[in-house]
C-alpha cells in the first residue's frame, strides 16, 4: 500500500516490471517528454488510468463475484462510499498472496487477497481510505506525471491519438505497475493517513483499524535491516499518530 511502503520494504508487494524494449523512434526528447507529462490534464490522467487499470486487470486473477473475497469487499465498499471527490469508484479483488492495495485517478480500486487474509474488515477499510486519499489529494496524478516524464514508460502524446493512443498495452501495464508501486514522501503519506482517518469518521467507521493495520505492519518490520524505504515514516509512529488523534477526539 502506500501504507504500501512498509509492505514493499518487506518484499511482499509485486515487483516492478521494466520496459526495456521500447522503440526509441517513438520518443520525444527528455525535455519535451517532461513538459508533456507535467502538462497532463485531469481528463488525460483518468484516460491513462482507465487503460492502465484494464491492462492490469487482464493480467490478474480477479475474484469471482460470488466469492467470499468479493462479498466481503462489497460490504467494505458500501461502508466507504462510491466516489472519490465525485469520481465514481469501482472495486475488485486480485487473487494473489501479495499484500497490497491501490487506487487510481479513474476510481479503479483493487485490493489483493493477501491483504484481506492479513487484515480484518476495519483495517481493510482504513487501508482503502488511505489509498483513496492519495487520489483525492493529487498524489497519484503527480506520480503519473513523474512516471511519464522520467521513467521508462515515456512516450510522446501525438496530436491525433492523444497520449493514450501513443502507449502500447505493455507500456500501459508498466505505467500501472509504476503507479501501484509508487513511492510517496513522508508528508504525502501522513496526509493520506489523515485523509483516511477523516473519511472513516465521516462514514461513521471507527478509525482504530488504521492504527491496528500499522501495528500489524510494525510487528512484521521488527528486526528488518535498513532499506531504501527508511525515509518513510515508521509504522509504529504512524499508528501512534492515529492513536493520538483518537484520544483527542475521545474515541476508544
Residues covered by each model-derived region:
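A Zn2+-metalloprotease active-site environment signal
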Residues: 2-8, 17-252
